[in-house]
Amino acid sequence: MTTKNLLVELFVEELPPKALKKLGDAFAGVLAEQLKALGLATAESVVTAYASPRRLAAHISHVWLKADDKAVQQKLMPVSVGLDSAGHATPALLKRLQALGADLSDPVAAVAALKRAPDGKAEALFYNSLVTGATLDTGLQKALEEAIAKLPIPKVMSYQLETDCELPGWTSVNFVRPAHGLVALHGSTVVPVKVLGLKAGNSTRGHRFEAAVDPVVLADADSYAVTLEIDGAVIASFAQRKAEIARQLAEAAAELGGGVQPIEDDALLDEVTALVERPNVLVCEFEKEFLDVPQECLILTMKANQKYFPLLDAAGKLTNKFLVVSNISPEDASFVIGGNERVVRPRLADAKFFFDQDRKRTLASRVEGLGKVVYHNKLGTQGERTERVAEIAVKIAQLLEGDALAGKAGKAAWLAKADLLTDMVGEFPELQGTMGRYYALHDGHSAEIAAAIEDHYKPRFAGDELPRNPVGVVVALADKLETLVGMFGIGNLPTGDKDPFALRRHALGVIRMLVEKDLPLDLGALVGGAAPVFGDKITDATPALLDFIYDRLSGSLREQGYSAQEVDSVVSQKPQRLGDVPKRLAAVRAFAALPEAPALAAANKRIGNILKKEALEVDPHVSELLLREAAEIALYAAMRDVVPTANAQFDTGDYTASLQTLAALRAPVDAFFDGVMVNAEELDLRLNRQGLLKSLHNAMNRVADLSRLVA
């Protein structure tokens, strides 16, 4: 018996475009997983998922018609329970054997066939049987039902079956969209499975308008994609369809010349791929007068509302041409082009109207209105929030550059949220900040302040750029700190995957600005300084918030490739200047490569354990008069030579050199532990030796907790 390839397709009405790829991958993945679990698919089986607006399909290679039979050994019960004193089967054993389908025509023979073997402290009876392998008919039926049940569908439809289906009029069918066809081919043979009231066959439907034949008959499983493309005018593969759209977009742009390029947006490309079965890219245009509107507005309305691809010139400026991905390919495309141009025109006109209307009022005149917009029922209005952000921004600016920066930061923070009350942002919330920059420039504010208004939301996502100037950095820090301190102060913390106020993202934003801009700001002072601006609205939760930020820092550093030990050694010290963290990590990595590192890290851990056992904090003071043993005298002398140099290097920020200098202490530290009893009976000696170790511990752990490097 040889394997053959399997093809399963579910033909449905138009599926949700944003979920299509996920649905296709899940459908194929669960089918293959179930068939492998049943022994029908092999380790060599290759799974290919297909997903188009009207179909989910899977091609699975190397599928058996029947799985191999399996020898199975099942534990029944202890011998003392299954057999009586004479060795005969008890009623309990006979009942269990009957349930397993054993032949009980000769109970004595049935019992004799059982295996006796130790099971823990007792002896047990085991039943050996041969389980018949699943057939493809039954196995695929189970796998198909499982695949449909496990599809990641947030909402399902209830619909009535067609009259030519099994059980016509049955209304309890639930699926993401009404299903109209089922294909199941093992090689060229139809597998007789049923699902959603449909019986499997060997024919499907092609393109709604352009299929050459209807229905499209499939000769075998392997001809699915080719036959569907030739006879049905459908590119079934999501990946191939996406690649074809990208190719046509690039080709259309190249034909226009002038260096124009379609905007790069992979999410939009995925969504459009999920909307068409045979893509056809067309070039359209709109009136140049609309280019007076900020291009972000035009690009957003074309992408979000119409799923168009705007064209940018070589300088990145929007042109008045755009690309449409059509699902039809008529000989004369002028009607399709004209229709799309007519549809987009009102959208662009609305954007122009909003832009013109918004500029009739200044941003400053809108700030007062923020007092009527509720931010949070416990934290007040957007107006109150604006005042808090401005106050925090001024404090941060004073720490960085003094009054000059503070004045600019205060003004930018005061204006930063005013565009929330504009018509454009009301229509397109994604443009908050961006429109604030345009309106600030129109009102005569400096480019620096205008940029800060736009940038104070940055970074908005992983990998996003940081604010472009110091004013923007200050306001962005203030905005994020206000959110974090306020939400923690009212106990509104993220839980699990729920983070409605994006506190994790805000924490990472604070971290990135402090680290990547290498700002000379202490994290504790920033958080502690932000809390008083809330007055009695919050409870000070600074310790919890700092722990949260350090936790996000640890996760971020591990994602960047640092080991858990490296990260833990640095972050456990809770460094106040996050800008120092990369240098500390580099120093730890360089130290770990030294031959002295393992011994010193282990010694550091040992010292820490000794000091932890003391009820009171150990005084690092050392009296030379109480140094008796040669090893402790040598260690003290070595520390006097090494530690001042290491401290000086630390103070100048040369953390790598500081740790490398301390590596010279390895030999005297080893000798100390080999030759000195720390907890001597004499109290003064014991305290002096503990003080020596405390002094050493302090010196060794300024850059990082070296004990965390011990595996």
Swiss-Prot record:
Would you kindly state one Gene Ontology biological process term found in this protein's UniProt entry? Answer: glycyl-tRNA aminoacylation
**Entry EC number(s):** 6.1.1.14
Report the domain of life of the source organism.
Bacteria
Provide the alphabetized UniProt keywords: Aminoacyl-tRNA synthetase, ATP-binding, Cytoplasm, Ligase, Nucleotide-binding, Protein biosynthesis
Q: Which InterPro entries match?
A: DALR_anticod-bd (IPR008909), Gly-tRNA-synth_bsu (IPR015944), Gly-tRNA-synth_heterodimer (IPR006194)
Q: Which reaction does it catalyse?
A: tRNA(Gly) + glycine + ATP = glycyl-tRNA(Gly) + AMP + diphosphate
Gene Ontology CC, one term: cytosol
Q: Name one GO molecular function term.
A: glycine-tRNA ligase activity
User: Is Cytoplasm one of the keywords UniProt gives this record?
Assistant: yes
Q: Tell where it localizes.
A: Cytoplasm
Predominantly, its location class is cytoplasm
Q: How does it assemble?
A: Tetramer of two alpha and two beta subunits.
Q: Which family would the database say this protein is a member of?
A: Belongs to the class-II aminoacyl-tRNA synthetase family.
Query: Any idea what this protein is called?
Result: Glycine--tRNA ligase beta subunit
Q: Which organism is it from?
A: Polaromonas naphthalenivorans (strain CJ2)
